[in-house]
UniProtKB/Swiss-Prot annotation:
Residues 343-402 bind DNA. Residues 235-245 have a biased composition (Low complexity). The lineage of its organism: Eukaryota, Metazoa, Chordata, Craniata, Vertebrata. Involved in early development of embryos, especially in the process of gastrulation. May play an important role in establishing and specifying rhombomeric segments. Seems to be required to maintain the cells in a highly undifferentiated state. In contrast to POU2, T-POU2 lacks DNA-binding activity because of its incomplete pou domain structure. Overexpression of POU2 does not have any effect on development, whereas overexpression of t-POU2 causes developmental retardation or arrest before gastrulation. Residues 220-234 have a biased composition (Polar residues). Residues 127-154, 187-255 are annotated as: Disordered. GO terms for biological process: anatomical structure morphogenesis; brain development; brain segmentation; cell dedifferentiation; chromatin remodeling; dorsal/ventral pattern formation; ectoderm development; embryonic pattern specification. Pfam families: Homeodomain, Pou. Keywords: Developmental protein, DNA-binding, Homeobox, Nucleus, Transcription, Transcription regulation. It is found in: Nucleus. Residues 246-255 have a biased composition (Acidic residues). This is POU domain, class 5, transcription factor 1. InterPro entries: HD (IPR001356), Homeobox_CS (IPR017970), Homeodomain-like_sf (IPR009057), Lambda_DNA-bd_dom_sf (IPR010982), POU (IPR013847), POU_dom (IPR000327), POU_domain_TF (IPR050255). Residues 249-323 form the POU-specific domain. It comes from Danio rerio.
Length: 472
């Protein structure tokens, strides 16, 4: 690129061309020296030609001015105009190898989307003859568990130039729980097979960014179906165990329970049984007694679904036995005898002599032990439970009446209130507390309480007419 010579007059007539190259180094003129920048005579020696200002004193058109001397370190001879037309790699360093981190991954890890630069040709892309691979035998057993060969890059396949930085595909092998999920998500996506016959083609991405099955470990791709097959019997076994425990809950529905509750109530009334009889019959037949409230809530569908499912088989068996038996009332005879024995006993009435004897024993010992209760019951001809209950009731009665006996006398002393002092006009001197004040260093100061008469306490707060009524 050459420039035609300009005379000083032509340069002075066109001061507006300020975007012309003023640095010969930037224009590729290697003939000029780089030690300093000097301009020719009449070329930008007068600042007023550009900024339309007056001439500075000392600067004349006849003399040449030197501007901004640069050293040779700032030369840009290597900068050429043709370098801007070729695309360059965005990262100048070589791509790191991650083959030592993940078993089964090769050194030629393909990026997500890389194509050869525009300026490079097929000859510029170097094809390595060998690509090292790591075997999976050390950690994952023999080589039979390896995935098919189409997932691995072997010798002779296309590679990527080493001057480009690559994104490392996210490998879920570091998270064991995610490998199966990722493999299932990529089942429908077939990994591309690299072509060895056409090395000029741009390398294809390995997957959609989450890692294709080729980036899994050696035994992962083949073990996924087996893991699913193993988890299936486990889940079925656990579910079968749950069904064995709650078969009735799964088979029964709310409509079935409602229908059975109506049927139970109708047949129970027809046979002449009460809800309490049904609860007693269940206890007699199956060893677990239910209350009348439980049977009532079952018939009213007020129990939880789980409890109703547990109670329905028992009620169904009782209903079948009650319908098939000739005399259903015989089912409750033994149970009724047992219930009668457990009924509340009749109130015990003691004679006067026995009562006075117990009072005398109570004065001597309000809390007799087991041996003393046995001795008293033998002397009076009473049952031990009767004597024990009488002493308990007597102690409660003594606490209510606050009678003076043993411990209760001591407790009563704490609750006794001292009688108020008689009212008088003089002050009441209270004993000192033992803490002398600063005004009385010698002894405890006396506290004087003013005397107040009861009629005069609330006179100020009452109505005058009511006060006159109180005085009268």
């Amino acid at each position: 690129m050459t420039e035609r010579a300009q005379s000083p007059t032509a340069a002075d007539c066109r001061p507006y061309e300020v975007n012309r190259a003023m640095y010969p180094q930037a224009a590729g003129l290697d003939g000029l020296g780089g030690a300093s920048l000097q301009f020719a005579h009449g070329m930008l020696q007068d600042p007023s030609l550009i900024f339309n200002k007056a001439h500075f004193n000392g600067i004349t058109p006849a003399t040449a001015q030197t501007f901004f001397p640069f050293s040779g370190d700032f030369k840009t001879n290597d900068l050429q105009g043709g370098d801007f037309t070729q695309p360059k790699h965005w990262y100048p360093f070589a791509a790191p190898e991650f083959t030592g981190q993940v078993a089964g991954a090769t050194a030629a890890t393909q990026p997500a989307n890389i194509s050869p630069p525009i300026g490079e040709t097929r000859e510029q892309i170097k094809m390595p003859s060998e690509v090292k691979t790591e075997k999976d035998v050390e950690e994952y057993g023999n080589e039979e568990n390896k995935p098919p060969s189409q997932y691995h890059l072997t010798a002779g396949t296309s590679s990527i130039p080493t001057g480009v930085n690559y994104y490392t595909p996210w490998n879920p092998n570091f998270w064991p729980g995610l490998s199966q999920i990722t493999a299932q998500a990529n089942i429908s996506q077939a990994p591309p097979t690299p072509s060895a016959s056409s090395p000029s083609l741009s390398p294809s991405p390995p997957g959609n960014g989450f890692g294709s099955p080729g980036f899994f470990s050696g035994g992962t791709a083949q073990n996924i179906p087996s893991a699913q097959a193993q988890s299936a019997p486990r889940s079925s076994g656990s579910s079968s165990g749950g069904c064995s425990n709650s078969e009735e809950e799964e088979t029964l529905t709310t409509e079935d329970l409602e229908q059975f509750a109506k049927e139970l109530k109708h047949k129970r009334i027809t046979l002449g049984f009460t809800q309490a009889d049904v609860g007693l019959a269940l206890g007699n037949l199956y060893g677990k007694m239910f209350s009348q409230t439980t049977i009532c809530r079952f018939e009213a569908l007020q129990l939880s679904f789980k409890n109703m499912c547990k109670l329905k088989p028992l009620l169904q068996r009782w209903l079948n036995e009650a319908e098939n038996s000739e005399n259903p009332q015989d089912m409750y005879k033994i149970e009724r005898v047992f219930v009668d024995t457990r009924k509340r006993k009749r109130r015990t009435s003691l004679e006067g002599t026995v009562r006075s004897a117990l009072e005398s024993y109570f004065v001597k010992c309000p809390k007799p032990n087991t041996l003393e209760i046995t001795h008293i019951s033998d002397d009076l001809g009473l049952e031990r439970d009767v004597v024990r209950v009488w002493f308990c009731n007597r102690r409660q009665k003594g606490k209510r009446l606050a009678l003076p006996f043993d411990d209760e006398c001591v407790e009563a002393q704490y609750y006794e209130q001292s009688p108020p002092p008689p009212p008088h006009m003089g002050g009441t001197v209270l004993p000192g507390q033992g803490y002398p004040g600063p005004a009385h260093p010698g002894g405890a100061p006396a506290l004087y309480m003013p005397s107040l008469h009861r009629p005069d306490v609330f006179k100020n707060g009452f109505h005058p007419g009511l006060v006159g009524h109180l005085n009268s």
